[in-house]
C-alpha cells in the first residue's frame, strides 16, 4: 500500500508569473492512493486497454490547487499526467511511467466572465455540460464535439471539432484566452493567463492550445471563448445554433451491397463534398456521417443533420441523400441496430424536425461505447482534401468484407468537414488542416481482452492498405492531409507502420510544428509534460 486512504497536498508551492492570482483559502486538493475505495475508478479512462497504477491521483478544484499539485510532483521528481474527461485513445494518461495523475474532473464550471467579456469553461466540464449551459442560459454555443462525456481540457487543445464546424468553424476559432499551469527552468510551477491579443507577450502559449494537443505545455485550468470581432451583451458573443434541425438516418444492408454499389456510395459522398464544402453556400449547416461498418454488422449508414429553419432545408437534405445514394441498388431501410458510436435510430428514417438541443443530446448521450464499462478500442484518422481515390475505395471494401474477421463494431466513419473551418489560415491556429473536406475515423470497439490482437491487426491492415501508395499513412498531398491529433495513434511513430517520409508530428501539425516546439521550449523547458506524442523540445 502506498499510504493512508486519503492524503492532502502540503502548502508552500511557489505561485507566480502571469496575472496576479487570488489567495487560495480553500482546503488542499484531495489525493487518492491505491488503498482508497475510489482509486480503481480514477486510474482508467473510457478505453479499458489503458489502466494505470499511479502512486497518487490528485483531484484539484481550483487553479491554486493545481499549482500546488504540479509543484509537489516536480519537487519530488514524480512523472505527471493530466486527465480531464478520460477519452484519450492511447495510453498518454494511464501508463506504467505515470506516478501522479492530476484529474481535473472536479473543475467543471461554465459561466460568463464580465472582466474578460468572455465565456469561461473549466477543463473538467464535459461537452454536453458546456453545450447545455451556454444554450440554456444565453442561447449561444461553441461548435464543440458530439460525445457527451468528453472533457473540454483535451478536446479544445486538440482543435475542438464538432457537428457545427462547417457553419461556425472549430471551437478553437473562438478561443480568446487560456489559463495554464506551467513549469519554468527554475522548476517553479506558475499559473499563466495567455490571450490572443496581438501584443500579449505570452500569446504563443494561447496559440499552442489552439490545436497543439493536450499534455505538452502544462495543465490547462480554464478556457475563455468569444467569437472574433464580437461585441455587446453575452448573448451576442458566441454563435447561435439553429433553433431546430432535421435529423435523418438511413441504413443500407450489406446483403444487397455489391462492390460497384459500395464504390458508388463512397465515391458519391466524396464528390458531393468536393462540390459543397466552400463556406457561404446553402449547405453550410449540413453535417453528415457515412458509417462504413464491417459486413458482420449487416449494414452501412448515412446520418445527416441540417438547420431546419433555412428556406427549403428539407429539400436540400433530400437532394444530398439522393446524390450520395442514388446509384446504389441496395434498398435503404431504418437503422435498427447499433453501429459503434451510433445507437439505433429507426425513428429518423423519415427526416424529423426537432429542437437543436434535443438532437444534440440524442446523438451524444445514446452513444453505446461510452456506457459499456468493458469497452476497449483502437483508432486511426485521416483528412481528405479531395474525394476518395478508387484505390482507397477498393482497399476499404476488401477489409470491410473480410470473412476472417468478425466485429459488428468495427468501421470507418467519414464525417463532413470544410466550410467555415477552411476560411482560417493554417498558421492562425495550431490546427493546420484548413483545406480538407472530409475527416475519417477508423475504429474498432470490443470488450474481450483476448480479441485485442485481432482487432488491432485488422485496423492496421486496412489502414496500411488504404494508404499503401504513401507509406501506409495519409501524408499531406493533393488528396490527403495527415491526421487528427485528438484521434491519437501511436503507430504513426513507428517505422514499421509509417514508412513515409512524414514523421508523426508532421501528420498532425504540418508546418506549425517548429512553432509549437518554440512554445514548448519557452513554457516547458524541462519537458515535465510529456507523453508518446507530446510536442518535443527543439533538437530532440
Where do the model's predicted regions map?
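C-terminal segment of N-terminal export signals and the immediately downstream linker at the start
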Residues: 13-36
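Loop/turn elements at helix/coil->beta-strand transitions in domains of secreted/extracellular proteins
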Residues: 27-29, 53, 75-80, 97-99, ...
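Glycine-rich N-terminal segment of FAD-binding domains in flavoprotein oxidoreductases
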Residues: 36, 48-107
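Glycine-/small-residue-rich beta-strand-loop submotif within the FAD-binding core of flavoenzymes
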Residues: 94-122, 163, 167-168, 225-227, ...
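Short, structural beta-strand-to-alpha-helix junction motif
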Residues: 117-118, 125-135, 149-152, 338, ...
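FAD-binding subdomain of flavoenzyme oxidoreductases
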Residues: 144, 149-255
Amino acid at each position: 500500500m502506498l499510504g493512508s486512504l486519503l492524503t492532502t497536498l502540503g502548502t508552500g508551492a511557489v505561485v507566480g508569473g502571469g496575472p496576479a492570482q487570488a489567495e487560495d483559502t480553500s482546503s488542499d486538493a484531495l489525493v487518492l492512493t491505491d488503498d482508497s475505495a475510489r482509486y480503481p475508478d480514477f486510474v482508467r479512462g473510457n478505453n479499458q486497454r489503458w489502466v494505470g497504477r499511479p502512486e497518487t491521483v490528485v483531484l484539484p478544484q481550483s487553479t491554486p490547487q493545481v499549482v500546488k499539485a504540479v509543484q509537489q510532483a516536480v519537487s519530488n521528481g514524480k512523472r505527471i499526467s493530466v486527465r480531464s474527461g478520460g477519452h484519450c485513445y492511447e495510453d498518454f494518461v494511464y501508463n506504467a511511467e505515470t506516478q501522479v495523475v492530476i484529474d481535473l474532473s472536479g473543475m467543471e464550471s461554465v459561466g460568463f466572465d464580465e472582466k474578460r467579456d468572455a465565456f469561461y469553461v473549466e477543463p473538467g466540464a464535459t461537452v454536453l455540460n458546456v453545450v447545455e449551459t451556454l444554450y440554456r442560459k444565453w442561447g449561444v454555443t461553441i461548435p464543440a464535439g458530439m460525445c457527451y462525456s468528453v472533457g473540454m481540457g483535451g478536446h479544445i487543445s486538440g482543435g475542438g471539432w464538432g457537428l457545427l464546424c462547417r457553419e461556425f468553424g472549430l471551437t478553437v476559432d473562438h478561443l480568446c484566452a487560456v489559463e495554464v499551469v506551467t513549469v519554468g527552468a527554475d522548476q517553479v510551477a506558475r499559473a499563466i493567463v495567455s490571450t490572443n491579443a496581438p501584443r500579449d507577450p505570452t500569446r504563443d502559449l494561447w496559440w499552442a492550445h489552439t490545436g497543439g494537443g493536450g499534455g505538452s505545455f502544462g495543465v490547462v485550468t480554464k478556457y475563455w471563448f468569444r467569437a472574433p470581432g464580437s461585441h455587446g451583451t453575452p448573448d451576442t458573443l458566441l454563435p447561435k445554433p439553429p433553433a431546430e434541425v432535421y435529423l435523418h438516418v438511413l441504413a443500407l444492408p450489406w446483403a444487397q451491397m455489391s462492390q460497384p454499389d459500395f464504390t458508388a456510395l463512397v465515391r458519391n459522398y466524396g464528390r458531393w463534398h468536393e462540390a459543397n464544402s466552400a463556406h457561404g453556400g446553402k449547405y453550410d449547416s449540413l453535417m453528415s456521417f457515412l458509417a462504413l461498418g464491417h459486413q458482420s454488422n449487416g449494414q452501412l449508414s448515412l446520418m445527416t443533420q441540417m438547420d431546419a429553419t433555412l428556406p427549403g432545408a428539407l429539400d436540400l437534405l433530400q437532394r444530398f441523400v439522393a446524390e450520395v445514394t442514388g446509384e446504389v441498388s441496395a434498398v435503404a431501410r431504418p437503422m435498427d441496430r447499433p453501429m459503434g458510436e451510433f445507437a439505433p435510430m429507426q425513428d429518423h428514417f423519415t427526416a424529423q424536425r426537432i429542437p437543436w438541443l434535443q438532437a444534440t443530446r440524442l446523438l451524444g448521450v445514446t452513444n453505446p461505447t461510452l456506457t459499456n464499462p468493458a469497452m476497449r478500442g483502437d483508432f486511426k484518422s485521416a483528412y481528405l482534401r479531395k474525394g476518395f481515390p478508387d484505390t482507397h475505395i477498393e482497399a476499404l471494401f476488401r477489409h470491410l468484407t473480410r470473412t476472417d474477421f468478425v466485429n459488428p463494431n468495427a468501421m470507418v466513419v467519414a464525417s463532413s468537414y470544410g466550410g467555415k473551418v477552411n476560411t482560417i489560415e493554417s498558421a492562425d491556429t495550431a490546427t493546420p488542416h484548413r483545406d480538407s473536406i472530409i475527416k475519417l475515423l477508423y475504429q474498432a470497439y470490443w470488450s474481450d481482452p483476448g480479441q485485442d490482437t485481432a482487432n488491432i491487426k485488422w485496423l492496421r491492415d486496412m489502414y496500411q492498405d488504404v494508404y499503401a501508395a504513401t507509406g501506409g499513412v495519409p501524408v499531406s498531398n493533393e488528396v490527403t492531409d495527415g491526421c487528427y491529433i485528438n484521434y491519437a495513434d501511436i503507430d504513426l511513430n513507428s517505422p514499421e507502420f509509417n514508412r513515409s517520409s512524414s514523421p508523426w508530428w508532421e501528420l498532425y501539425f504540418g508546418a506549425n510544428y517548429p512553432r509549437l516546439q518554440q512554445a514548448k521550449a519557452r513554457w516547458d523547458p524541462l519537458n515535465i509534460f510529456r507523453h508518446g506524442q507530446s510536442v518535443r523540445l527543439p533538437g530532440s
